Protein backbone atom coordinates (compact mmCIF):
# COMPACT_ATOMS: atom_id res chain seq x y z
CA UNK A 1 0.00 0.00 0.00
CA UNK A 2 1.27 3.47 -0.85
CA UNK A 3 2.31 5.90 1.85
CA UNK A 4 -0.09 8.73 2.68
CA UNK A 5 1.18 12.10 1.45
CA UNK A 6 0.71 14.87 4.01
CA UNK A 7 2.47 17.72 2.27
CA UNK A 8 4.47 19.00 -0.65
CA UNK A 9 7.11 21.70 -0.24
CA UNK A 10 8.61 23.64 -3.15
CA UNK A 11 11.88 25.47 -2.56
CA UNK A 12 14.78 26.94 -4.50
CA UNK A 13 18.06 26.20 -2.78
CA UNK A 14 21.62 26.95 -3.86
CA UNK A 15 23.26 23.70 -4.98
CA UNK A 16 25.38 22.05 -2.23
CA UNK A 17 24.36 24.80 0.21
CA UNK A 18 21.30 23.33 1.93
CA UNK A 19 21.46 23.89 5.70
CA UNK A 20 18.97 24.05 8.58
CA UNK A 21 18.74 27.85 8.51
CA UNK A 22 15.82 29.62 6.80
CA UNK A 23 14.20 28.97 4.37
CA UNK A 24 14.96 25.23 4.52
CA UNK A 25 14.73 24.61 8.28
CA UNK A 26 11.37 26.24 9.01
CA UNK A 27 9.72 24.82 5.88
CA UNK A 28 10.77 21.25 6.69
CA UNK A 29 10.39 21.62 10.46
CA UNK A 30 6.70 22.48 10.13
CA UNK A 31 6.15 19.14 8.42
CA UNK A 32 8.26 17.22 10.97
CA UNK A 33 10.92 16.15 8.45
CA UNK A 34 14.47 15.32 9.59
CA UNK A 35 16.15 18.51 8.35
CA UNK A 36 19.76 17.29 8.47
CA UNK A 37 18.89 14.11 6.58
CA UNK A 38 17.36 16.22 3.79
CA UNK A 39 20.28 18.66 3.74
CA UNK A 40 22.85 15.86 3.41
CA UNK A 41 20.87 14.10 0.65
CA UNK A 42 20.26 17.36 -1.26
CA UNK A 43 23.88 18.48 -1.05
CA UNK A 44 25.07 15.08 -2.26
CA UNK A 45 22.65 15.04 -5.20
CA UNK A 46 23.51 18.59 -6.32
CA UNK A 47 27.30 18.49 -5.98
CA UNK A 48 27.75 18.67 -9.77
CA UNK A 49 25.44 21.71 -10.14
CA UNK A 50 27.39 24.14 -7.94
CA UNK A 51 26.77 27.81 -8.65
CA UNK A 52 23.08 27.45 -9.49
CA UNK A 53 19.85 27.73 -7.52
CA UNK A 54 18.10 24.38 -7.79
CA UNK A 55 14.29 24.06 -7.59
CA UNK A 56 13.32 21.10 -5.44
CA UNK A 57 9.92 19.51 -4.72
CA UNK A 58 9.83 17.65 -1.40
CA UNK A 59 6.99 15.19 -0.78
CA UNK A 60 6.35 14.52 2.91
CA UNK A 61 4.58 11.34 4.04
CA UNK A 62 2.51 10.60 7.17
CA UNK A 63 5.39 8.67 8.80
CA UNK A 64 7.57 11.84 8.48
CA UNK A 65 9.66 10.29 5.72
CA UNK A 66 10.20 12.23 2.51
CA UNK A 67 11.25 12.01 -1.10
CA UNK A 68 12.44 14.86 -3.25
CA UNK A 69 12.88 15.70 -6.90
CA UNK A 70 15.50 18.18 -8.07
CA UNK A 71 14.81 20.08 -11.26
CA UNK A 72 17.11 21.93 -13.64
CA UNK A 73 18.25 25.45 -12.67
CA UNK A 74 15.88 28.28 -13.67
CA UNK A 75 16.23 29.45 -17.27
CA UNK A 76 17.28 32.91 -16.08
CA UNK A 77 20.25 31.47 -14.17
CA UNK A 78 21.37 29.52 -17.23
CA UNK A 79 20.95 32.59 -19.45
CA UNK A 80 22.92 34.84 -17.08
CA UNK A 81 25.77 32.35 -16.90
CA UNK A 82 25.88 31.90 -20.70
CA UNK A 83 25.83 35.68 -21.27
CA UNK A 84 28.43 36.29 -18.55
CA UNK A 85 26.31 38.76 -16.57
CA UNK A 86 25.20 38.92 -12.94
CA UNK A 87 21.75 40.46 -13.45
CA UNK A 88 19.41 41.45 -16.23
CA UNK A 89 18.69 44.98 -17.41
CA UNK A 90 16.50 47.22 -15.27
CA UNK A 91 14.81 48.46 -18.47
CA UNK A 92 15.24 45.76 -21.15
CA UNK A 93 13.68 47.87 -23.91
CA UNK A 94 16.31 50.60 -23.58
CA UNK A 95 19.32 48.90 -21.97
CA UNK A 96 20.99 45.84 -23.47
CA UNK A 97 23.32 44.03 -21.07
CA UNK A 98 24.64 41.21 -23.24
CA UNK A 99 24.05 38.90 -26.14
CA UNK A 100 23.57 35.21 -26.79
CA UNK A 101 23.95 33.23 -29.99
CA UNK A 102 21.45 30.67 -31.28
CA UNK A 103 24.00 27.96 -30.40
CA UNK A 104 24.08 29.14 -26.76
CA UNK A 105 20.27 29.19 -26.69
CA UNK A 106 20.21 25.58 -27.96
CA UNK A 107 22.70 24.54 -25.25
CA UNK A 108 20.38 26.01 -22.62
CA UNK A 109 17.40 24.25 -24.25
CA UNK A 110 19.23 20.90 -24.07
CA UNK A 111 19.68 21.33 -20.30
CA UNK A 112 16.26 22.80 -19.57
CA UNK A 113 13.86 20.93 -21.90
CA UNK A 114 13.07 18.18 -19.37
CA UNK A 115 11.39 20.76 -17.10
CA UNK A 116 9.66 22.78 -19.82
CA UNK A 117 6.05 22.48 -20.95
CA UNK A 118 7.11 21.54 -24.49
CA UNK A 119 9.21 18.75 -25.90
CA UNK A 120 9.78 20.53 -29.23
CA UNK A 121 13.28 22.05 -29.28
CA UNK A 122 12.24 24.82 -31.67
CA UNK A 123 9.43 25.98 -29.37
CA UNK A 124 11.67 25.64 -26.32
CA UNK A 125 14.28 27.83 -28.06
CA UNK A 126 11.59 30.49 -28.60
CA UNK A 127 10.69 30.37 -24.90
CA UNK A 128 14.34 30.72 -23.81
CA UNK A 129 14.92 33.50 -26.37
CA UNK A 130 11.91 35.38 -25.01
CA UNK A 131 13.22 35.05 -21.47
CA UNK A 132 16.60 36.36 -22.61
CA UNK A 133 15.03 39.34 -24.40
CA UNK A 134 12.99 40.20 -21.31
CA UNK A 135 16.29 40.37 -19.38
CA UNK A 136 17.81 42.85 -21.86
CA UNK A 137 19.89 40.29 -23.73
CA UNK A 138 20.07 40.37 -27.52
CA UNK A 139 19.78 37.05 -29.37
CA UNK A 140 21.95 36.94 -32.51
CA UNK A 141 22.36 34.34 -35.24
Curated annotation (Swiss-Prot):
Alphabetized, the UniProt keywords read: Methylation, Ribonucleoprotein, Ribosomal protein, RNA-binding, rRNA-binding
Q: What does the entry list under GO cellular component?
A: cytosolic large ribosomal subunit
Q: How is it modified after translation?
A: One or more lysine residues are methylated.
What GO terms in the biological process aspect are recorded for it?
Answer: translation
- A Pfam family found in this protein is Ribosomal_L11
Instruction: Reply yes or no: does the keyword Nucleus apply.
Output: no
* Taxonomic superkingdom: Bacteria
- The residue ranges crossing the membrane are none
> Could you describe the subunit structure of this protein?
Part of the ribosomal stalk of the 50S ribosomal subunit. Interacts with L10 and the large rRNA to form the base of the stalk. L10 forms an elongated spine to which L12 dimers bind in a sequential fashion forming a multimeric L10(L12)X complex.
List the HAMAP family.
Answer: Ribosomal_uL11
Q: Output this protein's name.
A: Large ribosomal subunit protein uL11
- Encoded by which gene? rplK
Amino acid sequence: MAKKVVGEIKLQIAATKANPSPPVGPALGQQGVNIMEFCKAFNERTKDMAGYNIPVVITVYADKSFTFITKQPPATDLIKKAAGITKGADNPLKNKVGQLTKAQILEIVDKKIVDMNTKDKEQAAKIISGSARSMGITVVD
